[in-house]
Structures are given as C-alpha cells and as structure tokens.
Amino acid sequence: VMTYFSPAVFDGKVIMQGDNIKATGMGSSQMDQYAETAQPGEFSVWSDAMFGGMPYVTGYGQAAPSMPSYSIVDGWLKKVGYGDAAMVFTGLVCFYLLMCVMGVNWWLAIAGAFAFAFASYNIIIIEAGHIVKAYVIGYMPVTLAGMALLFRRSYLWGAVLFLLGVALSLANGHIQITYYLVLLCLLIYVGYAVRKIK
C-alpha cells in the first residue's frame, strides 16, 4: 500500500480528487456563514448552492456534528494518508480479519484482502474523492465478521466486531453505503436462518 501511494505518502504529492474540489465549492457559502455567525454547537444543515437548495448534513471536511468521534479506533490509521493510502490499508486489514474469522488459510486471506482493497472500484472512488464512502466500504468486513461470529455462538467477540463495524460505518457518515450494508446483513441473516431451518 505504501509503495502504491508512495508519491502521496513520502513525497507530499496530492491526488486531485475532483469531487472534493466540487464539494468545497458547494459548501463554501455554508462554511462562510458558519465561520461568521455560528455559536458553539450550531450547524446549518441546508445549502442553497446545490440544486436550488437541498439538505447538507455532512459539513465540508467533517462528519455530522451529532456523531461521536471514533478517532481512538481509526485515528492512527488515517494519519498514514487520510485521502489515499489509509483507505486501502483499512480495506486490507478489515477483509483479512473477515477471512480469518471465516477460517480461510492465511495466504488465501492475504490474497483476498489485496483483491478487495485494490478492486478497481475502490481505486476509482479514491481518485474521485469519495473518501468516507471508501472508509465505510473498508469497514464492511468488520461488521460481517461480527455477524459470522454471532452465528457461531461466539457472542462476546461477535458483538464487539459487529457493533464496532456498525459504529465506524455510521461515524464516517456515508449513509448510502451503510444502508447497503444493512441490506447485505439482512440477506446474510435470511440465508443463515434458511440454512438453520433445513
């Protein structure tokens, strides 16, 4: 991961993430108003710069203010390269964890982790600047590993991993991908239930 992103990590170069540039423009009036008039704890959730006005529930460069911070869990990781290398490393570690929980050989787990983390879509969304989307996708395997442990009656570690995965998904603030995670969890639950009934 560090080799792939070495220009960004070691040379200080920046990936020009187009959607981040656009988001800066879309949220500039809101951020200006926030800087001039906001009291502590106040945050505008409406932007007049997009489509003639629409909700703007995640601020420029920050999670929604009502969400707790989980920087103690993933803050060290995001220091590696928040907008590039850390996202891929998150996917590597989390998918490797899922494969280990599923009982896969370590070498196959490593291969699967690389396949997951370096999937073309993940690289495309990094270039586009969909940072929180990439993190939520990267944390999905933690939730799934927790589910697998819960179904194997390993309740303590299953609950810890499941709740940690859900918390990190919500804290990173990409509701669409979290919604897809909920649908995936429901499908897996139905599959386990059908298998259990048979």
Language-model region placement:
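Membrane-embedded helix bundles of polyisoprenyl
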Residues: 90-102, 106-195
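Membrane-interface coil-to-helix junctions
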Residues: 2-95, 114-141
